[in-house]
C-alpha cells in the first residue's frame, strides 16, 4: 500500500465567560499530518498557579494528561512520552505532542485552579 496522508485535527475549547476572566487556549483549531509536531498553549485564570491538560477522543470521556503547579510537573497520565509540556513563570502552560499519530485526533482542554 502506498503512503497515505492522514489528517490530524486538534480542537481546543476556549473557557466560558468573559475572555479576561477565564482560561484561554490557543490555537482554537489545529490540523496537522501524521508525524508532525503540535503545540497548544493555555493561559490560566488570573491568580491560578495550577494548570491541567486533558484529552477527549471522539466517543470517549476525558482523559487526564498533565498537571503543572508553580512551574513543576506534579502528575502525568498514562500517555506516551511524546506528550510533554511545561509551565512558564507567569503560570501559562504549553502542551506538545511529537510524532503525531491518527489516534491523537481529539479535543484537548486545559483548566486552572489555585
From Swiss-Prot:
Any single GO CC term annotated in Swiss-Prot or TrEMBL for this entry: T cell receptor complex
PROSITE patterns hit by this protein: IG_LIKE
Keyword annotations: Adaptive immunity, Cell membrane, Disulfide bond, Glycoprotein, Immunity, Immunoglobulin domain, Membrane, Receptor, Signal, T cell receptor
Span of the signal peptide: 1-21
Cysteine disulfide links: 42-110
InterPro entries xref list: Ig-like_dom, Ig-like_dom_sf, Ig-like_fold, Ig_V-set, TCR_beta_variable
Domain of life assignment: Eukaryota
UniProt entry tagged with the keyword Chaperone: no
Gene Ontology terms: biological process: adaptive immune response; cell surface receptor signaling pathway
SMART domains noted in UniProt: IGv (SM00406)
Protein localization: Cell membrane
Domain Ig-like: 22-114
Gene3D superfamilies: Immunoglobulins (2.60.40.10)
Coiled-coil regions listed: none
Sequence intervals crossing the membrane: none
Glycosylation sites noted in the Swiss-Prot or TrEMBL record: 90
Subunit structure: Alpha-beta TR is a heterodimer composed of an alpha and beta chain; disulfide-linked. The alpha-beta TR is associated with the transmembrane signaling CD3 coreceptor proteins to form the TR-CD3 (TcR or TCR). The assembly of alpha-beta TR heterodimers with CD3 occurs in the endoplasmic reticulum where a single alpha-beta TR heterodimer associates with one CD3D-CD3E heterodimer, one CD3G-CD3E heterodimer and one CD247 homodimer forming a stable octameric structure. CD3D-CD3E and CD3G-CD3E heterodimers preferentially associate with TR alpha and TR beta chains, respectively.
PANTHER family reported for this sequence: T CELL RECEPTOR BETA VARIABLE 5-8, T-CELL RECEPTOR BETA CHAIN
Function, in words: V region of the variable domain of T cell receptor (TR) beta chain that participates in the antigen recognition. Alpha-beta T cell receptors are antigen specific receptors which are essential to the immune response and are present on the cell surface of T lymphocytes. Recognize peptide-major histocompatibility (MH) (pMH) complexes that are displayed by antigen presenting cells (APC), a prerequisite for efficient T cell adaptive immunity against pathogens.
Protein name, as recorded: T cell receptor beta variable 5-8
Species assigned in the record: Homo sapiens (Human)
Lineage: Eukaryota, Metazoa, Chordata, Craniata, Vertebrata
